[in-house]
Amino acid sequence: MGEVTAEEVEKFLDSNVSFAKQYYNLRYRAKVISDLLGPREAAVDFSNYHALNSVEESEIIFDLLRDFQDNLQAEKCVFNVMKKLCFLLQADRMSLFMYRARNGIAELATRLFNVHKDAVLEECLVAPDSEIVFPLDMGVVGHVALSKKIVNVPNTEEDEHFCDFVDTLTEYQTKNILASPIMNGKDVVAIIMVVNKVDGPHFTENDEEILLKYLNFANLIMKVFHLSYLHNCETRRGQILLWSGSKVFEELTDIERQFHKALYTVRAFLNCDRYSVGLLDMTKQKEFFDVWPVLMGEAPPYAGPRTPDGREINFYKVIDYILHGKEDIKVIPNPPPDHWALVSGLPTYVAQNGLICNIMNAPSEDFFAFQKEPLDESGWMIKNVLSMPIVNKKEEIVGVATFYNRKDGKPFDEMDETLMESLTQFLGWSVLNPDTYELMNKLENRKDIFQDMVKYHVKCDNEEIQTILKTREVYGKEPWECEEEELAEILQGELPDADKYEINKFHFSDLPLTELELVKCGIQMYYELKVVDKFHIPQEALVRFMYSLSKGYRRITYHNWRHGFNVGQTMFSLLVTGKLKRYFTDLEALAMVTAAFCHDIDHRGTNNLYQMKSQNPLAKLHGSSILERHHLEFGKTLLRDESLNIFQNLNRRQHEHAIHMMDIAIIATDLALYFKKRTMFQKIVDQSKTYETQQEWTQYMMLDQTRKEIVMAMMMTACDLSAITKPWEVQSKVALLVAAEFWEQGDLERTVLQQNPIPMMDRNKADELPKLQVGFIDFVCTFVYKEFSRFHEEITPMLDGITNNRKEWKALADEYETKMKGLEEEKQKQQAANQAAAGSQHGGKQPGGGPASKSCCVQ
């Protein structure tokens, strides 16, 4: 095949345009653009000032774009713009002043200084320790920053804003100035200042136009880099808050560990060589033994600095984080005053004033006059510092965080202040966590102490137990030194006979017995249930537990130990005499009788509603069934004591089940729950009548835990109300005790709460007691015993008792009604007689002269 000529190729490409375009894009397009934008020699000669043609100006613009693409450093890009502007404006010098805020005060600092057309970046870039700083109320640049407009000063000697201190400093004479702000929206980012026109007396309007035109490049550069910097700062800020937040919520117990975890985790985002955290002593008031020497004149009073809330400034711990060279963390308890982070006095100053301090040139500040040489062997010296207080939610300064030497050599700026402030503010707020934990810990410790105090006064002591377990008298030793057989022998002689005391009868009365005898009767019930040997209940623990229960009930009118015992005795009678034990295991019977004895322990003589009205702490602790939950917790607290724990030899599963049954039983004594459960109980009673044999029903019930719990709950209600079923001689006395306690609550409501009590609790309506009793029997009590007598006919004596008592109360109520009716009739007769007498005296007319009314009379 012969060689292809150029003409043939051209002809082929002309006739195949799509192929030509595809081939060009694939092979040459990238290279052409790369060559176009790649580095090349400047097409304009900058060695001498001369007028530019349009081609040369285009070349300058293209050079600026290429520089912007190639350079990642803002100062270098702006420097190139300034060099070209020096040539275009034929100016001698140019400078760039960056706008910033330090400690909340705005200022302008040199970043590029003395830029000319032949300048080198390294010579013009100002180091942080060599900055010239202008406040906004000083100099032409300050005026430009405030006005945000371009300023042309033809003659500096005639300008009121001009300040010559830089000329004095540099031995340079500024004759004329052209200055313009670089804006980011409405905010000043920097000021570019052009000085001394070379080819004329001053800068012209044309120069202003050129400056503004080319400042668009500088403006774009500054905007891009400023936004990039802001994005970087916000990213760092987000990372700092995220990571510190995760560590803060990992450590809730101790402020020191919390701060350390958070600050160590975010060290990579803080962008500094070192940082130090000083934790302040939060003591506001000294102990009396520390104050006495001062008051006696033996020690001088504290005259040092104080925090804004009046605390003495005492850094009890300093944590240093060293990030340059080899990373190191140092924790210094009780740091000495000459510690490198405290010797300057800056942390103390920050703690005293609560201000953020940003020191951009540390060696020039009085705080760091001590720094004559490197602080350690690494040769490290403090160059710039950012220090700020750590403030909690109560606005108390809990510590001071100080950051040293920004890694890029520049001083800390406003964004650094914002970022570090976010961190310290978050840490300050997070102090709430360990504070709350400490408070909860103290409350928990106080609770344990109070429980111990209560137990000390409630628990059966070694002298009291000898009234029942007379081991000293019989064996000459303490109960814990005796064998179980020896204790059983003593109890056999001390405990009452169940049949003699009729503790298994529904008509049992506690009135003839002493409280100690009731304790002995309670112990005997456990033996009658045959649970002592089966569950290996320590007999000493059983005696101590029952005696402690009797002491746990308060000495109040009705809800005292006698009531607690009566409820336990009725539960025992329902299980044994009422034959309800067939549905429950021995363990459940043990739990039910124990719950009945515990059900009202530490009762205050007032009901749940009063606890809420009086804002009692119990009402805040328990949302519902307030007193019942308190009785339950009190009983469980006693059982947690090893010397009182009658459940101590149960296995884990048995123990959990026993406690579960106690929970349900005691909470069920809340009458507010009674109306919810009685319909369910009635259905169970109805269902029991559908079974042909008692054995089938018993087997069914034993396997259904829910139904057993409902029956148990209703049994607790029957036990709690059982006083209403006792013989009239007993019931009438007990009813007066109940009424007396209600009246005491009514008195409290009237005097303490300034409220009128309900009729049942109103002492002034004591005569209505029989009527109220009849209503209570009809509305609350009768259903319970009627259904139980249907359920088990052995419980019928309780229904008979309440029926008889209703008749007695009804008779008294009717007698009262008759008496009140007679009094009312007598009153009406007296009123009629008085009316008639008044009418005859005035001739059938009222004293006012009008006719007498036949239907009313004004007394």
From Swiss-Prot:
Task: Write down the species.
Answer: Bos taurus (Bovine)
**Could you tell me which residues carry Cysteine methyl ester?**
C856
* Biased composition range(s): Gly residues: 841-851
Q: Which residues form the GAF domain?
A: 73-222, 254-431
Question: What binding details are noted for the cofactor?
Answer: Binds 2 divalent metal cations per subunit. Site 1 may preferentially bind zinc ions, while site 2 has a preference for magnesium and/or manganese ions.
Q: Which family does the record assign?
A: Belongs to the cyclic nucleotide phosphodiesterase family.
Per the record, which residues fall in region Disordered?
A: 821-859
| Gene Ontology MF terms | 3',5'-cyclic-AMP phosphodiesterase activity; 3',5'-cyclic-GMP phosphodiesterase activity; metal ion binding
Q: Is Electron transport found in the keyword set?
A: no
Q: Upper lineage ranks? A: Eukaryota, Metazoa, Chordata, Craniata, Vertebrata
**Where does the protein end up?**
Cell membrane; Cell projection, Cilium, Photoreceptor outer segment
Q: Which InterPro entries match?
A: GAF, GAF-like_dom_sf, HD/PDEase_dom, PDEase, PDEase_catalytic_dom, PDEase_catalytic_dom_sf, PDEase_CS
> Where does the record place Low complexity bias?
830-840
Can you quote a single GO CC term?
photoreceptor disc membrane
Name of the protein described by the UniProt record: Rod cGMP-specific 3',5'-cyclic phosphodiesterase subunit alpha
Catalytic residues, chain numbering? H559
Residues holding a divalent metal cation 2: D600
Q: Which cofactor does it need?
A: a divalent metal cation
Q: Which Gene3D superfamilies does the annotation name? A: 3'5'-cyclic nucleotide phosphodiesterase, catalytic domain, 3.30.450.40
* Domain of life of the source: Eukaryota
Query: PANTHER family attached here?
Result: CYCLIC NUCLEOTIDE PHOSPHODIESTERASE
Q: Please list the residue ranges annotated as the PDEase domain.
A: 483-816
Membrane topology (UniProt)? Lipid-anchor
Sorted keywords for this record are: Acetylation, Cell membrane, Cell projection, cGMP, Hydrolase, Lipoprotein, Membrane, Metal-binding, Methylation, Prenylation, Repeat, Sensory transduction, Vision
